[in-house]
Regions:
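Hydrophobic/aromatic-rich alpha-helical bundle segments in the mid-to-C-terminal region
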Residues: 103-110, 123, 127, 145-191
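An amphipathic alpha-helix adjacent to DNA-recognition modules
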Residues: 8-16, 28-29, 49-73, 88, ...
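Short secondary-structure transition hinges
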Residues: 96-138
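Helix-turn-helix
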Residues: 2, 13, 21-55, 59
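Hydrophobic alpha-helical connector segments
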Residues: 59, 73-102, 158-162, 185
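N-terminal intrinsically disordered/low-complexity leader segments
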Residues: 1-9
Length: 197
């Protein structure tokens, strides 16, 4: 049992250190050697845990998204908030996390461009990584309609509507290099109010 715990602990340490390398170097310039150096281990040891840098990157992103999902689920289960407040708080929480991880978002964009150049569909990767988030948004919307707090509309349309704010936030932070999302926050709050009864 102790060996498994040590293995998992070391794996998490590698992922945490790999994120630092990816943020400093970008996906294309990050190497197994740089990750090993950041971890303070031999490169050959990395191969005991991961087969290549793409696998490390994917697990690093997955770990980060799990953290985001935990934050969102805690908002979702907060009984003191109505549906409008929950959706607003979730979007604002996501905006804050995006602002805090601006550099990582640039690396993710770099990675998606890299995949596209390799002939791999970035859309499939993004969809797989965001399906839980979209499900959470959909379930919050369904709950709000069921409770008579939100207007009736197609769930997919509502989900796309809310998710478009997340995409806009990423675009503003990474592509247009906005300092913060204050204007988008105001727009999102206004838009969510329009969904309320």
């Amino acid at each position: 049992m102790a060996i498994i715990v040590e293995h998992d602990k070391r794996r998490k340490q590698i992922l945490d250190n790999a994120l630092i390398v990816f943020m400093d170097e970008g996906f294309v310039n990050a190497t197994f050697q740089k990750i090993a150096d950041q971890c303070g281990i031999a490169r050959t040891i990395l191969y005991l845990y991961f087969k290549n840098k793409k696998e490390i990157f994917n697990y690093s992103i997955k770990q980060l998204l799990l953290n985001v999902e935990e934050n969102i689920n805690s908002v979702r289960s907060d009984k003191s908030l109505n549906s409008e407040e929950k959706i607003t708080k979730v979007l604002l929480t996501i905006f804050k996390l995006l602002e805090q991880n601006r550099q990582l978002l640039s690396v993710v964009l770099d990675y998606l461009v890299h995949l596209s150049k390799e002939g791999v569909s970035p859309e499939d990767r993004v969809r797989r990584r965001t399906v839980k988030l979209r499900h959470i948004l959909s379930s919050m919307f369904i709950e709000g309609v069921k409770n008579g707090e939100l207007k009736k509309m197609k769930v997919k349309a509502a989900d796309d509507y809310l998710y478009s704010f997340i995409e806009a936030a990423i675009f503003q932070l990474v592509v247009t290099k906005r300092k913060n999302l204050s204007e988008l926050r105001e727009t999102a709050i206004f838009a969510i109010k329009q969904l309320s009864l």
